[in-house]
């Protein structure tokens, strides 16, 4: 039993050198710069391509997106809008992002915001209620 255990320990200690695993400081002697440490056996590979930070890459992506948006949102090539960009009094303003045509009117909603229309609201603090 003891001989089997000693034999297995010797084999485990002798296995890494036979497989070519280099242990110790010897492989690190030829490394002078950090970019040589990645793959010293391949001189073409280095960390130069990996040195870009994520902030630089994110900035490049944002610049590309901004250029693409500038091309899409060119004001000369934009389609003409409809002439009416407001909601008249007593017309539905439900789900619309345009204001009421009358500056004294607001979008008034009833029945749990299911029915909305432009309406003049008269209050004492509202300057439009006097007219």
From Swiss-Prot:
Coiled coil region boundaries: none
Entry-linked InterPro entries? Agouti, Agouti_dom, Agouti_dom_sf
Marked site positions, Cleavage:
81-82
Q: Where is this region: Interaction with melanocortin receptors?
A: 110-112
Xref: Gene3D superfamilies? Agouti domain
Keywords in UniProt for this one?
A: Disulfide bond, Golgi apparatus, Knottin, Secreted, Signal
Which BP terms from GO are recorded? adult feeding behavior; circadian rhythm; eating behavior; hormone-mediated signaling pathway; long-day photoperiodism; maternal process involved in female pregnancy; neuropeptide signaling pathway; positive regulation of feeding behavior
Record's subcellular location: Secreted; Golgi apparatus lumen
Q: Which residues form the signal peptide?
A: 1-20
Q: Where is the Agouti domain?
A: 86-128
Do the record's keywords include Membrane? no
**Per the record, GO CC terms?**
extracellular region; extracellular space; Golgi lumen; neuronal cell body
Q: In which tissues is it expressed?
A: Expressed in arcuate nucleus and median eminence, adrenal gland (medulla), hypothalamus, testis, and lung.
Molecular function via GO:
neuropeptide hormone activity; type 3 melanocortin receptor binding; type 4 melanocortin receptor binding
Q: Which PROSITE patterns match?
A: AGOUTI_1, AGOUTI_2
The cysteines joined by S-S bonds are 86-101, 93-107, 100-118, 104-128, 109-116
Q: Tell me how this protein assembles.
A: Interacts with melanocortin receptors MC3R, MC4R and MC5R.
The record's domain comment reads: The presence of a 'disulfide through disulfide knot' structurally defines this protein as a knottin.
What this chain does, per the entry, is described as: Plays a role in weight homeostasis. Involved in the control of feeding behavior through the central melanocortin system. Acts as alpha melanocyte-stimulating hormone antagonist by inhibiting cAMP production mediated by stimulation of melanocortin receptors within the hypothalamus and adrenal gland. Has very low activity with MC5R. Is an inverse agonist for MC3R and MC4R being able to suppress their constitutive activity. It promotes MC3R and MC4R endocytosis in an arrestin-dependent manner.
Task: Return the protein name.
Answer: Agouti-related protein
What species was this sequence derived from?
A: Mus musculus
């Amino acid at each position: 039993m003891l001989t089997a255990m000693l034999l297995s320990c010797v084999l485990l200690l002798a296995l890494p050198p036979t497989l070519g695993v280099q242990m110790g400081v010897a492989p690190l002697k030829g490394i002078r710069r950090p970019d040589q440490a990645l793959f010293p056996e391949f001189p073409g590979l280095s960390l130069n391509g990996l040195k870009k930070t994520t902030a630089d890459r994110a900035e490049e992506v944002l610049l590309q997106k901004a250029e693409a948006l500038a091309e899409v949102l060119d004001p000369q090539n934009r389609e003409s809008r409809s002439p009416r960009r407001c909601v008249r009094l007593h017309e539905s303003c439900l789900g619309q992002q345009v204001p009421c045509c009358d500056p004294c009117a607001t979008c008034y909603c009833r029945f749990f915001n299911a029915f909305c229309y432009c309406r003049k609201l008269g209050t004492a603090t509202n300057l439009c209620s006097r007219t």
